[in-house]
């Protein structure tokens, strides 16, 4: 409650009042928000995952795994790599295809919907689908600067979703990665992202004299960006969860707060509001043992490391089938089978 009051005081009075009654307004189905808060040497990244379903797995991915991206379209050239970093990811569409996560170097990558995304045309570069792109970054890089340097050599070949990405690292560097008009656009310094392009969001926010309380992407961006520029007083982790309350919608499913400095992940869900935590520094990163997972709605709260269990194909397939049920007819033939079976083809190369 103290944190909520602090956040209210950090915003103009007109917003603070209307924010408390804005919950009844209708929200779009895809209303995700990601932001970074920073104070001194402390940094956290918050993510509100707003979707029409909330099932998911929290996955501990190991370093030393040899991987090859599955082709999405005829002519796609596979990307090949060996994971250099372990990571904790949040997966609704199966292992290796996360909606976001953080690696053991403190690099955070999160995915949000962007209707205006137009991906680059097929060419000779290696390609990854729109979700595996996130896992590739977490597997390979320690910083946003490394991601930016490597980005021109890779393209996204989408299965279905039109998305963009916000990446932040333990130094406080952030960048938005987008596909606009068939070109990859990277914006270093972005500290917040919702469901409009970063450029459009910044332009709209600059015209607002009072912080808006509405549910639209541009309104949520304005709130998140201004709070990112002036974080609420007090504990930064608690402040991030309070900010997530201010950008939430009736479809908010997951609230995630990453601490890239201390390599800690905290999360809560619509189905279980107790905060759960995982400490990457205490997890087994070696691929000598299987990837591990836990249901995102696990109960009770607290450290869930003891509830992690070895990855199994049946759990992965069940999640994918549930999550793709509504759009399965619009996916390429065999997509579900490919996604469900893909992790079984991965091998530990350097335990």
Per-segment meaning from a language model:
Residues 1-7:
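N-terminal secretory signal peptides that target proteins for export/translocation
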Residues 10-23:
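Bacterial N-terminal signal peptides
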Residues 25-31:
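Sec/Tat signal peptide C-region and signal peptidase I cleavage site
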Residues 33-95, 112-139, 163, 169-351:
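C-terminal, well-structured catalytic/ligand-binding subdomain of enzymes
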């Amino acid at each position: 409650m103290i944190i909520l009051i602090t956040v209210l005081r950090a915003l103009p009075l007109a917003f603070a009042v209307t924010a408390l009654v804005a919950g009844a307004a209708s929200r779009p189905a895809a209303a995700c928000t990601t932001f970074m808060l920073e104070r001194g040497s402390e940094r956290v990244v918050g993510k509100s995952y707003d979707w029409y379903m909330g099932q998911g797995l929290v996955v501990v991915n190991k370093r030393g795994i040899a991987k090859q991206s599955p082709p999405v379209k005829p002519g796609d050239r596979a990307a090949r790599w060996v994971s250099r970093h372990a990571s904790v990811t949040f997966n609704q569409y199966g292992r290796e295809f996360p909606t976001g996560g953080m690696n053991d170097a403190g690099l955070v990558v999160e995915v949000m919907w962007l209707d205006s995304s137009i991906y680059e045309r097929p060419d000779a570069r290696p390609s990854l689908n729109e979700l595996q792109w996130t896992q590739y970054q977490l597997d390979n890089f320690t910083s946003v600067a490394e991601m930016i340097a490597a980005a021109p050599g890779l393209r996204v070949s989408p299965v279905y979703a039109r998305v963009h990405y916000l990446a932040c690292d333990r130094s406080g560097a952030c960048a938005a990665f987008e596909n606009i008009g068939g070109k990859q656009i990277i914006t270093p310094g972005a500290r917040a992202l919702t469901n409009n392009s970063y450029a459009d969001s910044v332009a709209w926010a600059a015209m607002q004299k009072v912080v808006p309380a509405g549910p639209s992407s541009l309104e949520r961006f304005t709130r998140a960006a201004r709070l990112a520029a002036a974080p609420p007083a007090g504990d930064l982790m608690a402040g991030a969860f309070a900010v997530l309350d201010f950008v939430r919608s009736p479809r908010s499913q997951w609230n995630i707060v990453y601490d890239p400095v201390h390599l800690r992940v905290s999360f809560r869900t619509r189905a279980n509001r107790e905060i759960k935590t995982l400490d990457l520094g205490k997890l087994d990163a070696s691929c000598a043992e299987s990837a591990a997972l836990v249901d995102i709605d696990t109960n009770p709260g607290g450290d869930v490391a003891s509830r992690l269990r070895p990855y199994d194909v049946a759990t992965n397939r069940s999640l994918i089938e549930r999550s793709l049920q509504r759009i399965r007819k619009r996916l390429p033939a065999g997509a579900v089978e490919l996604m469900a079976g893909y992790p079984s083809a991965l091998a530990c190369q350097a335990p």
